[in-house]
């Protein structure tokens, strides 16, 4: 049986605010003591750059850094060389959008929905202004659900990118990403998934879904701020222009 009191004791924020009922984890999760300890331990015991030093403390961090990449690869079922560290999912989505910029041209269409987080909207607005891409919207129902029929209606030969949240951050609607990937790829379009809300709560297998890119944040799944993940198919990461 789930021991709620025991779990609450793992979180100093709750211990220090005993009357708190926290319902804002979709925005950011609370941090357990073990995560706080790990961050403090880095600054107190083994501070160094990664892959820049040839001494004991640096070697500790190299192993932690690379080991975490392996754990992320296991979590989402991909190769470790397909895992890129970012600051958060917003940074991941910006890196993807601007990394694809050389592959897009004026008149190309990006499909999103009206239910997207600003992180999955503003980069496309920027590219619309810079290079003249078109932004079109997939129709959803009143609960922000995409149906396969409405997605098929939205797709056309001019669509080069489809970018949607697997789970919406407001209503929690779960989109049929696997089926959408198959349809998008049949048109030659890239499929980008905002996994900020799905990866913390669902099994996400990027190979099974066949997504081209996926982003998510550590801070929404009991991790620290300033850590995000960008997954991309290796051949696509190799083909993209680095964004500095």
Task: Indicate residue ranges for each PLM-predicted region.
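Pyridoxal 5′-phosphate
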Residues: 1-244
């Amino acid at each position: 049986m789930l021991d709620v009191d025991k779990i609450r004791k793992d979180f100093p924020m709750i211990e220090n605010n005993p009357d708190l009922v926290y319902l804002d984890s979709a925005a950011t999760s609370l941090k357990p003591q073990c995560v706080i300890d790990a961050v403090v331990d880095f600054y107190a015991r083994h501070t160094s750059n990664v892959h820049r030093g040839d001494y004991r403390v640096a070697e500790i961090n190299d192993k932690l850094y690379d080991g975490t990449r392996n754990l992320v690869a296991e979590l989402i079922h991909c190769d470790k060389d397909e895992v890129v560290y970012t600051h958060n999912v917003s940074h991941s989505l910006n890196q993807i959008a601007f990394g694809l910029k050389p592959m897009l041209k004026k008149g190309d269409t990006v499909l999103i929905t009206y239910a997207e987080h600003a992180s999955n909207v503003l980069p496309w607005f920027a590219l619309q202004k810079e290079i003249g891409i078109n932004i079109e919207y997939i129709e959803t129902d009143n609960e922000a659900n995409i149906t396969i029929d409405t997605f098929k209606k939205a797709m056309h030969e001019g669509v080069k990118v489809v970018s949607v949240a697997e789970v919406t951050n407001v209503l929690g609607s779960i989109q049929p990403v696997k089926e959408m990937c198959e349809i998008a790829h049949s048109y030659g379009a890239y499929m980008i998934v905002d996994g900020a809300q799905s990866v913390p709560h669902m099994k996400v297998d990027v190979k099974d879904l066949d997504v081209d890119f996926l982003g998510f944040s550590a801070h929404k799944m009991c991790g620290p701020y300033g850590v995000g993940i960008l997954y991309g198919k290796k051949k696509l990461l190799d083909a993209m222009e680095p964004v500095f």
